[in-house]
UniProtKB/Swiss-Prot annotation:
Signal peptide: none annotated. GO terms for molecular function: cysteine-type endopeptidase activity; protein-phosphatidylethanolamide deconjugating activity. The gene is cpr-1. The lineage of its organism: Eukaryota, Fungi, Dikarya, Ascomycota, Pezizomycotina. Residues 1-21 are annotated as: Disordered. Belongs to the peptidase C54 family. Keywords: Autophagy, Cytoplasm, Hydrolase, Nucleus, Protease, Protein transport, Thiol protease, Transport. GO terms for biological process: aggrephagy; autophagosome assembly; mitophagy; piecemeal microautophagy of the nucleus; protein processing; protein transport. It comes from Neurospora crassa (strain ATCC 24698 / 74-OR23-1A / CBS 708.71 / DSM 1257 / FGSC 987). This is Cysteine protease 1. InterPro entries: Papain-like_cys_pep_sf, Peptidase_C54, Peptidase_C54_cat. It is an enzyme of class 3 (hydrolase).
Amino acid sequence: MTSSRPSGRDSTGWQETVSNTSPKLVNAMEAARAGAAEVGRVGRRFLYRIWDWEPVNNRTINEPVWCLGCSYTLDIKQYGSPLSSSSLSQLTADTPPLDKSQLAATHQHQDFNGVRTTATATCLSDTSMSAAPTGSQLGSFDTVPDSVTSGYDSALAYEEPGQDGGWPPAFLDDFESRIWMTYRTDFALIPRSSDPQASSALSFAMRIKTTFSDLTGFSSDTGWGCMIRSGQSLLANAILIARLGREWRRGTDLDAEKDIIALFADDPRAPYSLHNFVKYGATACGKYPGEWFGPSATARCIQALADEKQSGLRVYSTGDLPDVYEDSFMAVANPDGRGFQPTLILVCTRLGIDKINQVYEEALISTLQLPQSIGIAGGRPSSSHYFVGVQGQRLFYLDPHHPRPALPYREDPRGYTAEELDTCHTRRLRQLHIGDMDPSMLIGFLIKDEDDWDTWKSSVKHVQGKSIISVSPYDPARGQGGGRAEAIDEVETLESDDDGEPALGA
C-alpha cells in the first residue's frame, strides 16, 4: 500500500542521534518542532483572515455555480414560476442538458449595480442524471475565470439589499439554507482524560493552554473541534434533506427545522452533540477530549451515533478506503428486503500526499454536482471546512472557525428563538481553489431509494479524470467474491500520524 507516512529512518534519525547525548534535548527539540508547526498554522490562519475577501461572480461569463447537485445561473431573458417541460429548451447554453424530469426555477433580483436580472436554478432529479456533468460541459476551467475576489472584507456580506456579489440569488438562498455548525463556547464541561498520554495527543496550543491553566475540562471546542463540527454539518444536512427534501429553504416549516437543530445542541442529552462525538471518539477511536479528529474517526462517530439514536437515517461508511460494496450497502439500507431506507454514504479518502493529485480533481468536483451530494468535510491542512458548492475549480464552504455561545438543549424544540436558528446559517460565501485543498477528506452522499442507488453507481463511475470511488458487488469481508486487487495501489493511505489518521483540527 502506498503510504504518506515518511520512513522510520527519515522521521526518527535526528532523534536517534540526539538521544545518545541527552533525552531532555530530544524532548526540547520535539517541543520546538511542534511549536514551529503551530506558529506556521497560526500564521497561515492570520493571512487567510486578512485576505479572506468575499468572492464576486463574473456576470459576463455567467458560469453555472453548484450547490449540492443544484446548478444556478443568472438569466436576463427569463422570469416567472417553475418552467414547464416546453420551456426547458430555453435554458442557457451554459447549463448542462436537462430532461423533463428536471426542475428549474427563476428568481428576479436587483443586483449590486442596480440591474434587474433573473437567476435560473436547475436541480437535477434523482433519476435524470446518469453521469456527473464534466468540466467540458461547463466550460473550460483553465481558460475562463470562474469568479473574482472583491476588494473588501466583511462578515456581513450580502446582508444588505443588492449586495449579492453578482451571484444568483437562488444560489445564495440555497447556500444560506444549509445547516452550519461552528465552534461553541460555555457549554457543559467535557472532562479531561486522566490518561497520562492524553496531553501529548493535544495540539501544541492546547498543550500550552492546559499546562498553564487549571483546566479540568473543556467548555469550548475552539482550537480542536472543527472536524467534528464539519461532520455535524454534513450529518445535519443529510437529515434535513431526508426529512424536508432538497427544495427546502429557510423560512418554511420552522418547527421541522427546529427539530433537526435540537439534535445537535451542545448538551450530552442531544443525540449528535459535540459531547457524544467526543464520548464515542474516546471509547472507540482512541481520541482524547481536546484532541483533533480526522475524517476516519468522524465517520465512525457519525455511523455509531446514527445507529444508536435511530434518527430515521441509516449510515454506511467505507472505512479507510473509498470502496463501496453493494452487498454491505444493501445490508444497511434494506436489510430485510422489505423496504429501502434513506442511507448516508460516507467515503473516507486521501487523494494525494501534500495536495490533491490533479488526476482526481474533475472527479472530486463532480461529487458536488451529483443530486445525491451531501458535501465534503475536509479543507486546508489542520483546518477542516464543510464544502457544499463549486464553480469551475473554486469550491465554496461553510467555515466552522467562528466561536458562538453554546446552542442550548430544549425539551421542546419549538422554544428555539430566531436568533438561535440564525447562528446555524450564513449567507457569507467563502471559497478555496481545489489545488489548495488538503487531500484527506470525508465525502457524503444521500441515497433515498433503489433508483437513486442505481443512478449514483453509474454517476461515480462515469466521471472525467480518475474515479475517486469504486463500487463492487461483493465485500470480501463478508466471504463473497473478492475485492479489487488494484485498489491498494490506487489509494493513498489515510495514515499520517501516530494515531493512524490525519487530524484536521483548528
